Amino acid sequence: MELQTLQEALKVEIQVHQKLVAQMKQDPQNADLKKQLHELQAKITALSEKQKRVVEQLRKNLIVKQEQPDKFQIQPLSQSENKLQTAQQQPLQPLQQQQPQQPQQQQQQQQQHAQQSAAAPPSLTASQKTVTTASMITTKTLPLVLKAATATMPASVVGQRPTIAMVTAINSQKAVLSTDVQNTPVNLQTSSKVTGPGAEAVQIVAKNTVTLQVQATPPQPIKVPQFIPPPRLTPRPNFLPQVRPKPVAQNNIPIAPAPPPMLAAPQLIQRPVMLTKFTPTTLPTSQNSIHPVRVVNGQTATIAKTFPMAQLTSIVIATPGTRLAGPQTVQLSKPSLEKQTVKSHPEAEEKQAESRTVTPPAAPKPKREENPQKLAFMVSLGLVTHDHLEEIQSKRQERKRRTTANPVYSGAVFEPERKKSAVTYLNSTMHPGTRKRGRPPKYNAVLGFGALTPTSPPSSHPDSPENEKTETTFTFPAPVQPVSLPSPTSTDGDIHEDFCSVCRKSGQLLMCDTCSRVYHLDCLEPPLKTIPKGMWICPRCQDQMLKKEEAIPWPGTLAIVHSYIAYKAAKEEEKQKLLKWSSDLKQEREQLEQKVKELSSSISKCMEMKSSILARQKEMRSSLDKVKRLIRLVHGVDLCRPVDSEATAGALSNGPDCTPPANAASTPAPSPSSQSCTANCNQGEETK
């Protein structure tokens, strides 16, 4: 019963494991799922260990009961193989749909397994190792009724082809079984021993899938999803017996960037390139060495040959036909005063290439492996991989100062194109858009260190001193019209020449940013000691800009730079205007605030003055009232005084006895006006 409970627990854990594997396929980068998967694997491993111990205990109990008769008959090997083949054609049922077998049958299987292990001869068991299959796999996951084979199988059967491959191990490690082990049929109902020389003891426990494949029945393969953990947890096996992985494209070859369509299948047409006539005065060295360079299918072959001091004329003709099989060398004619034509043949030149000094190109640095479909897709979109980006960034340092001693100068494939001048389009004889930098491989040239004018044919100046040093003629087949050799400015990526515009020699040259001319630092007037930083314009372009005689064909990058400079200038001007406007507004605001302060102070002063004026007005009114009263008093005093004077005068005239006269009694009483005046005078005196 303990074995049955362990099997049920393993069944549940395996179902959960399969669900986790399905989730991991949808989201392989989820860390939580990985953690749960590792924990579940640890649980399954622990349960399998417990089951192993229970099986070993049952095996010991069965060994004690060896005297009991065997309840199952061992069938021959051929019958078991036939049953294996017929049973493997049936699909595997899910784990939850299979019926568990009885514990009595499991005990019988353990008993049978113990008897088989006891019946094995010592010669076989000493040299063979066992592969233990947990009984949970057989009783719960496989609906196959397969009989076990005898351990003492004949040796002739061992050499046959494998019949079964059995598969998933602990921690998702695949069990590697040799062909001899696979030849012996596996008893899938019992924990049997599969004997075979060279097979190591591996405990196979189903963690996520069980795969059975037979080569004889390929039409119905059994596909069960599998999950492969990270490489640090699963060491990759050296040999997988019946597992055939999906063929992977070979990507261990360094992948070069996809060439343009015109370079996909270059064909070398019969085209004599140039006839160069050298004199001893034009050769710089005393040995008169000529270094011709031939480019065939992207490989360079440099040949150095020494000639005596004599006038030399040679013609180099490419072989007619299609693409050449391998790199070929150029034959140089012997020194003579007559013209000699040399044709290169593949058979003869292969023998001569061994004796000549061929300088192969340097071995390319190993690049990162890339998918060719991915590269083609990126190239079609105009994208660049990391390796090509590093190449472009490293080659940007060579832009200002590069050596042109080697005429086969190849630049970056993905470098942005620049505009071509009208002269370049007129001199170009090839279809534009074939190469970025350097010379195309279909032109073969014998180049010397003499004065060579690449852009102008010699017939235009027959009497010039340069024509005496260099004579260049071109011969083409009959239907083709004779044209001039394409100048170094005929390529799209680099519109600059390869020779100094002053001395007509190669070397370390400084390129003008506005035209195709190049100069030595020493040939300039005044000569430069270091490379100038930023944009450099040659003297001729400076003169043209000053005179405004011709329109200079600006390259695209320079036009972008100038437009950006103009844009920045406009932005700066607008910024300055806005700053000035803001400063003016701030100043005006400050002035207004000052005016507000002044007005507020003046208003406060006015209010104070108003209050003071009102107070003074009140005081003045009170004082005016007092003055009016005083005036009234003064008027009242003046009215009372005449009456008193008359009375006193009458009294004096009457006599000293002051008796009034007789008619005094008859005088009327004083008028009320006089009485009022006296009253007022009395009041005025009282106020005083």
UniProtKB/Swiss-Prot annotation:
Chain segments annotated as coiled-coil in the UniProt record: 571-609
The species this protein was found in: Mus musculus (Mouse)
Protein name: PHD finger protein 21A
Keyword Coiled coil: yes
Subunit structure: Component of a BHC histone deacetylase complex that contains HDAC1, HDAC2, HMG20B/BRAF35, KDM1A, RCOR1/CoREST and PHF21A/BHC80. The BHC complex may also contain ZMYM2, ZNF217, ZMYM3, GSE1 and GTF2I. In the complex, it interacts directly with HDAC1, HDAC2, HMG20B/BRAF35, KDM1A and RCOR1/CoREST.
Protein keywords: Chromatin regulator, Coiled coil, DNA-binding, Isopeptide bond, Metal-binding, Nucleus, Phosphoprotein, Repressor, Transcription, Transcription regulation, Ubl conjugation, Zinc, Zinc-finger
Xref: SUPFAM superfamilies: FYVE/PHD zinc finger
Gene3D superfamilies associated with the record: Zinc/RING finger domain, C3HC4 (zinc finger)
InterPro entries: Zinc_finger_PHD-type_CS, Znf_FYVE_PHD, Znf_PHD, Znf_PHD-finger, Znf_RING/FYVE/PHD
Modified residues (Phosphoserine): S456
Disulfide bond sites: none
Residue segments, region Disordered: 78-127, 327-373, 449-471, 650-688
Tissue expression from the record: Expressed in the brain and testis. Weakly or not expressed in other tissues tested. Localized throughout the central nervous system (CNS) in brain, including the cerebellum, hippocampus, and cortex. Notably present in neuronal cells of granular cell layer and dentate gyrus in cerebellum and hippocampus, respectively. In the seminiferous tubules, the signals it is present strongly in spermatocytes, and weakly in spermatogonia and round spermatids. In some cases, it is also observed solely in spermatocytes (at protein level).
Main location: nucleus
GO biological process, one term: negative regulation of transcription by RNA polymerase II
